[in-house]
Amino acid sequence: MEEKQKSLSPPPCPSTVTVRRNPPRRARATPFTTTTKPPLSSLACAKPHDVPTFPIDEILSIQIPQSEPKPAIAESLKIFLRIKPLRTFTKVTTTTKSRPRNVWPQNPSKKNNAKENRNPEITKKVRKKDEEACITLNDSYSVTLTPPQSLQELKRSKTEVYEGFSHVFPADCSQNDVYDKMVQPLLEDFMKGKSGMLAALGPSGSGKTHTVFGSLKDPGIVPITLRQIFKKNDESCSGSLRSFNLSIFEICSERGKGEKAYDLLGGESSELSVQQSTIRGLKEVPIQNLEEAESLIGQAMLKRATATTNSNSQSSRSQCIINIRASCNGFSNETKLQSSDAMLTIVDLAGAEREKRTGNQAIDFGLPGTDPYFILFLMPTIPLTMNTRYLLAVTVGVPEEPKEGIAETSSKFFGSLTRYLRDYLEGKKRMALILTVKAGEEDYLDTSYLLRQASPYMKIKFDNTEEPCNKRQLKTFPRAEKNKKIKLSAPKTSQIEENFQGERCQISQEVNLQGKKADPTDRSSPRLEHVAQDKNEREHIIMRNFSKVLWNVLKQCNEKLKVAEGEIFTLKDSLRREQLKSLGLETELISLKSSCLAQPCIPEVEVIVNAKEHFEVDAALTNERNVDDDSCNLIKARREAGAEESSETPVPKVVRNVDDDSCNLIKARREAGAEESSESPVLSVLRNVDDDSCNLIEARREAGSEESSKSPVPNVRNVDVDSCNLINPRREASTEESSESPVLSKNVKDAELVPCHLSSENDAEPRQSVNSEENVGIPSTITHVEAEVTDFQRDQNQDDPTPSPEQVEVSQDCINSGLSNVQTKSAISRRFPDSEKQERNRRLLPASSRSLTEEMNDLEIKDIQTEKQQVKTTNTRVQKKAVSIQGQETEVPPREAEPASTKKQKNGQKPKRRLQPASSVLLTREINTLEIEDDIAEPKVNRGGKKTTVSQPRSQGSVTLLRLLTNNLHL
């Protein structure tokens, strides 16, 4: 077995080993192409291959040369001392009295005493001797403190020498000297990315604030530091890659209370909360130039808490901290690394001194030796590093554990400032102190106390360790940010090419940074890239603001468009309404024009006129009398002329047509039945008359055409009588009408009936009993002709059966006028239906005329009924009435003078008369033109008293025409 193991042992490893990173090897076969596995017996029989082992021991035994670590640089705490120059006191005196010119010489000694006694106000200019300095400068690193003579006599103090200062500034030094020695090293480290702090402490009036801030003529540390920062930033190549921010706040410690922090660059109530080395709510203002920084510092100084003490008129009562933060936005070619944000802190502490001497009420801790220079006791109260603690315990003699009183005082009243300055007090960051003292004899105690407390800390040393950079060394490529910023606009090809080229440049830059050496001359690419990035960001901001403005403008336009659309809609609606109104007005205008064309003459009706207008009535009646006289004379002349003229006068064929229509209507009424005759006895009388007239018409037709051609005039002889007389026979029934109509009797008082023009035909509905087409069924043509001869036929037909030529001519005129009215009415009925005509008539007729027309219709109906009652009496009365009509002219007195029953005057004298037009004929024309439908015809009584068997009602016109034809048959 041992032999087998020896044979299987690998050969010895050579002295040199070559390791290939990627050795060539063949690809393995896929499992589908592999052959069947050989049996285990064959594997056992096969000899194993000789595989050498990996030489781990040799590799581990190789010694790699390591770089020697740099020894830590032990630096001592830098403490500077500045001595304030002494002050000289001068008193200027003025004399109120001048010496007179002419005086006797006096003793000089007596003269001086007399002046002092007499004039105590008079003083003289006395220069006080220079104050003796209690501190003297030995060299740049040590001073000697000498007590004044008063203290030396009492043997309370001795001369002391203090050494170990980083530098001592004499009284005649300038602000630039202080900056060069103390601030310049801190500023250089700050520009390289290292943080640092500078604190100024000392008694009130020693020059702390003057050293830190200075004045306009002699600026202090802070203004000079800012000036140098911007100057170096402009000179350096990486200046554009660094930005600066400024923040100023104060921490106030009040008596018996804790601490409060306030932001001096914020608003009025800008209280802060201190959390370790960070302050929540602190405002950082970016600064671009020196002017902005100086204006911010001046604004903060005005808000700082100050108070008046015995040693200074404006003593700082708070701890003022000024922070200047530098942030790097790119790569620094000097350091070849991206450094973290650096902070330069300058602290102006409050004035600290003995309370009894200065009257300072701001700080009083009750513990001796802890109130003025608390910062010197902060280091023992916080956990320091091992090195710092060891140095404090061995070299200085500071106990490792601080005293209880000091720890309580520091933690209670300086907790905020202690936590904020923790990194500097532990030695992690660089810190420098400047002590300001006064060299006067009066300030010996404060100066001695300050130097004794600061002397142990001059020997403290700490390791200057580099802070590790927490940020990444390489800047990531901002592709996602660019995509986010270019959301509003579509990417262009030029932009895509620029981005690709920028990526390539940055990748090559990263490769160069990873190498050992980089080209120091190549400084343009990061700067150009940063400039391009700033330009893109600026363009993005401009486009975003422009898009916001454009969106607001579009919103305003949209609102205005909505308002305009609403106004357009209202205007369209109003326009539509106006169009409808205009259409209605046009329709009404057309109807008015058609009515005016269809009715050339305005009908006349009788209306009730007030008694005040009697003079107009008299004038109308006078004209009517003249017309009646002329017409009567004309008729008499024609009667004397003979029958020859009557044969020559042409008569239209309308009478024959009227006879035919009336005969047909009478036959139709007979077939209607006997129901109406039983209901109204008056209609039965009319039917009897129609029967007789129908028989007479048939007999007349048999006579032939010779009769009509030779003498057509006798058929209408009796038509002229009423139109010749033009006297209303219904005057006889005026008394009965006034008694029957109470409404009319009220309106008839002090009034007369006169002709009047009306423009409406719709209000004649009360006259339905006189002329009705709907109930009777007679056409308008027959009704119109018959109505003209209705009233006059009752009286004239009995007296004079034989017509005269004058009567025939007058009747011819009446028939022609009736035919013209019939044609006008038929034209109107074709154009307008009955419903439209009635609606138009109602609209055109005024309310007053309607009421008057109704009253007149009632009056006329009652007149007709009165006449019919008079016809029923006797034939004798009818004959007398006919004689009176032919021989005499009827007098028409006023309505008020009419008796209850009118009678004809039998005397031979011709009374005064008032003639009126044939009102019945005029009213009939108006009613026929307007197609007013009447009720059932008024009851009539036959002369012989016989009742007809015809049950169908007849109109007044047809009865009158039949009576006319009957009277003319026997001629």
Swiss-Prot record:
Residues reported to bind ATP: 202-209
Keywords: ATP-binding, Microtubule, Motor protein, Nucleotide-binding
Annotated region (Disordered), positions in chain: 1-44, 93-121, 700-856, 872-917
Signal peptide coordinates: none
Segments of skewed composition (Basic and acidic residues): 700-709, 785-797, 831-842
GO cellular component, one term: cytoplasm
A GO molecular function held by the record: ATP binding
Comp. bias (Low complexity): 29-39
Pfam families: Kinesin (PF00225)
SUPFAM superfamilies xrefs: P-loop containing nucleoside triphosphate hydrolases (SSF52540)
Top-rank taxon: Eukaryota
GO BP term, pick one: microtubule-based movement
Domain Kinesin motor positions: 76-460
Matching Gene3D superfamilies: Kinesin motor domain
Compositionally skewed regions (Basic residues) per UniProt: 903-915
Compositional bias of kind Polar residues: 768-783, 809-827
Family that this chain belongs to: Belongs to the TRAFAC class myosin-kinesin ATPase superfamily. Kinesin family. KIN-6 subfamily.
Listed name of the protein: Kinesin-like protein KIN-6
